[in-house]
Amino acid sequence: MKKNLLLTLTLCLLAQWSVAQAPKWVEKAKRAVFSVVTYDESDKILNTGNGFFVTEDGMALSDYSLFKGAQRAVVINSEGEQMPVEVIMGANDMYDVVKFRVAISGKKVPALVVSPTAPTVGTSVYLLPYSTQKDRSYTAGQVKEESKVEGQYHYYTLDMHLKDKMVSCPVMTADGQVFGLAQKSSGKDTATICYAVGADYAMSQKISPLSFNDHALSSIGIKKALPDTEEQALVYLYMASSQQ
């Protein structure tokens, strides 16, 4: 009995120490993390997961798997407020990322700054979970390996245990910038290893004139954004109309 009590007290003290040691930016940064709920064509819940804002006007990142087959989606912020996903801005099914814009309810939302540089191997990193509580909880780990995606973007192996409900939560540098989206590992190393696709790669996803035939995008029933330039947008609209 005494041993169990001692163990409980020790765990509580460790948890309190972890929160006390949390970087000062954690509580504020967690406000940019949200829950995502997607719905199918019958308006029944399809999937639930996580995502986070990367601009104050509502641009956000999450995992593609969450949106595949969805006809609509909403995000629920740390205050419990629901906001609809307005348009899909890009997606990649191989690396399981999606970029989208949320129809925000106010003038701006809390957003994370995407790190311009990749953290080096051995660097301490922090995963921020979605929470409606104002706390500074996080999961700490280290960068185990770093590799390239398409020659210029990044993919990471992390020394970090990832729970199911933490997929697509932001992984942060020590100075509070997001560099990756958390992804699950498979096999025998799931207890100690997880992965993160670079936030830089997720941000690079976009709609091009040829995106109308993109299988990953067409598998999402939510409205797509137009390409960035007027010329590309006209080509995209022409391609779309010719397929109808």
What are these regions (language model features)?
Residues 162-182:
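Catalytic nucleophile loop of clan PA
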Residues 27-42, 237:
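A short, Trp-centered hydrophobic/proline-enriched beta-strand micro-motif
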Residues 55-137, 152-155, 164-166, 231-233, ...:
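Conserved active-site neighborhood of the chymotrypsin/trypsin-like protease fold
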Residues 4-14:
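Sec-dependent N-terminal signal peptides
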Residues 34-36, 51, 58, 62, ...:
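Terminal peptide-recognition signature
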Residues 21-23, 38-57, 63, 81-84, ...:
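A conserved glycine-rich beta-strand in the N-terminal activation segment of trypsin-fold
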Residues 21-27, 70, 107-109, 178-242:
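C-terminal cap/linker of serine protease catalytic domains
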Residues 14-20:
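Sec/Tat signal peptide C-region and signal peptidase I cleavage site
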